[in-house]
Regions:
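Bacterial Sec-dependent N-terminal signal peptides
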Residues: 1-24
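Bacterial Sec-pathway N-terminal export signals of envelope proteins
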Residues: 20-109, 286, 292-329, 409
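Periplasmic alpha-helical coiled-coil/stalk elements that build and connect Gram-negative outer-membrane
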Residues: 26, 54-58, 82-84, 192-313, ...
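Short segments within alpha-helical structural elements
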Residues: 32, 259-284, 437-495
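Small/polar, glycine/serine/threonine/aspartate-rich low-complexity segments that form flexible
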Residues: 40-51, 98-164, 295-304, 336, ...
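Sec/SRP-type N-terminal targeting helices
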Residues: 71-75, 88-89, 153-156, 170-198, ...
Length: 496
């Protein structure tokens, strides 16, 4: 019995272990599935929560997911798609159902009062004309006359009507086709507007990202410069104690230390503000403590240009040009729409009409109806040249749109040329700044050696340190200038 109990206990423990392991595997599988299906925005948010560095692509994904303008453009594109679907329905037949009730103070009379009086007294009148003196016969004829009057009664003081009508456009002068073309173009424009908002968002986030990176590198530079002048200050203080330097030399270096500390504070403030802007653009709390992937690098990586500013065919990637081209197309369709208003229009209609009283059965108080089919033709004849004026105005709008498109093409050409030129100039500045850094480092090394040997003054060392800092700062500026110039060139060509 004890052995049986032990066996049962072991079996239960094994089953519990298997169940726990199964739950663990299921949980792990669920987490892996969620990670696979997570959007780039969710993955970026998790990375921020984990405290990891944010890459440029991560910031891009977060900005695209958060940007309100871009979200609005997506809704506008969906709205344009619904309007296009609405325009398609104009080709199809439409069914309308109507009903009504009318209560009148008087009913329609088919007989006038004289006819009613004659019919009511027809027996008396015929008796006088034919010499019939039998009152019973006259009364019978009068009663028959009253029945005739009652038979002509419409009894329509209360009228009820219901109808169902189907209308099919046959020819509307091209208005339906033009309206559908306009709806198609509007949907394209909505998509282009969304792309334009996307490119603007990417341009802004790229500029902000590289601004933060440059300020981080400048902060590192400012701290390095502060360490240099602090070391010089320590050396000068020791020399003053040893009697080989004057107090004036120490004051000069102290002023330089204060300036370096002020520079560090200014760069820290600028870096904090730039990070606030980056966090706001990415949809994070502005006080978030973020770290960018390119901050840790000693230098900003300079990549080769991925676009060619001389590629004029690529200019048509610009959403602005595509929008203006669509505007020209819409104005042309608007001309057709204005012309269609004054062309013949043909409609096919059919339906069923039901009324009470029944006009097809002596106005009896019951519902009855009739089927009907017809063709409606509308031909404008004379409207004092109104259609001609509207068509001319629409053509003038097309001309204006074409001129705006041509002017914008010229401006885009100029913008691309300017961005390409600025990129080349930025690369030249970077090459010169790199050479200046090498020379400044050598100059600083020689100044330190000369100062230790006693052949150079503290002012010479401070000048060398200042020149080194300026050279390093110019190099950082040129690196970021290349990055921003590349972003601007991509935006100018439309390759964001």
């Amino acid at each position: 019995m004890n052995r049986l109990k032990a066996t049962i206990v072991l079996s239960l423990l094994a089953a519990a272990a298997v169940a726990q392991e199964t739950d663990h595997h299921e949980t792990q599988h669920t987490i892996e599935c969620e990670a696979r299906v997570a959007s780039p925005q969710v993955q970026a948010a998790r990375r921020v929560m984990a405290g990891g560095p944010l890459s440029l692509q991560t910031c891009r994904d977060m900005a695209l997911g958060y940007n309100k303008t871009l979200a609005s453009k997506r809704v506008q594109r969906e709205m344009a798609a619904q309007m296009r679907k609405s325009a398609r329905t104009k080709y199809l037949p439409s069914l309308d159902v109507m009903g009504g009730a009318i209560f009148s103070s008087r009913e329609i009379s088919i007989l006038n009062n004289t006819q009613k009086s004659t019919l009511k007294n027809i027996g008396t009148s015929l008796g006088g004309l034919l010499g019939i003196s039998d009152p019973k016969l006259q009364g019978t004829l009068n009663h028959l006359g009253q029945d005739v009057v009652d038979g002509f009664r419409t009894n329509n003081r209360a009228m009820y009507m219901a109808s169902a009508m189907v209308t099919q456009p046959i020819y509307m002068g091209g208005a339906i086709t033009a309206a559908n073309n306009i709806a198609d173009i509007n949907e394209k424009m909505a998509a282009v507007n969304e792309e334009l908002a996307r490119q603007n968002t990417l341009q802004n986030i790229d500029k902000t990202y590289w601004t933060v990176v440059s300020l981080r590198h400048k902060l590192n530079l400012a701290n390095s410069f502060l360490q240099l002048v602090q070391k010089l200050d320590d050396d000068v203080q020791k020399m003053i104690t040893a009697g080989v330097a004057t107090k004036a030399d120490g004051l000069k270096v102290s002023v330089k230390v204060n300036e370096a500390e002020m520079a560090v504070t200014q760069v820290e403030d600028g870096l904090s503000l730039a990070k606030m802007l980056l966090c706001q653009t990415c949809g994070m709390p502005v006080e978030s403590d973020i770290t960018l992937a390119d901050e840790a690098a000693s230098t900003i990586a300079i990549e080769e240009d991925s676009v060619n500013g001389a590629d004029t065919v690529a200019y048509w990637y610009r959403p602005e040009l595509e929008l203006l081209s669509n505007t020209v197309d819409i104005s042309r369709q608007a001309t057709k729409l204005a012309r269609a208003t004054y062309l013949p229009q043909v409609l096919l209609s059919g339906g069923y009409l039901m009324t009470n009283p029944n006009v097809y059965d002596g106005f009896t108080r019951k519902f009855a109806g009739v089927w009907n089919v017809g063709v409606v033709v509308r031909i404008p004849v004379w409207h004092w040249m109104d259609g001609t004026y509207k068509v001319r105005a629409a053509k003038a709008a097309t001309t204006i749109a074409e001129l705006e498109l041509a002017e914008t093409q010229e401006k885009v050409d100029l913008q691309v040329s300017q961005c390409s030129f600025k990129l080349k100039e930025a690369r030249k500045k970077y090459a010169m700044a790199t050479k200046n850094v090498d020379k400044a480092e050598e100059n600083l090394r020689c100044a330190n050696v000369g100062f230790k040997e006693g052949v150079l003054q503290t002012t010479d060392v401070m000048e060398a340190q200042t020149a080194w800092m300026q050279a390093q700062s110019q190099k950082i500026d040129s690196e970021v200038e290349i990055k921003i110039a590349q972003v601007n060139l991509k935006k100018a060509i439309g390759h964001m």
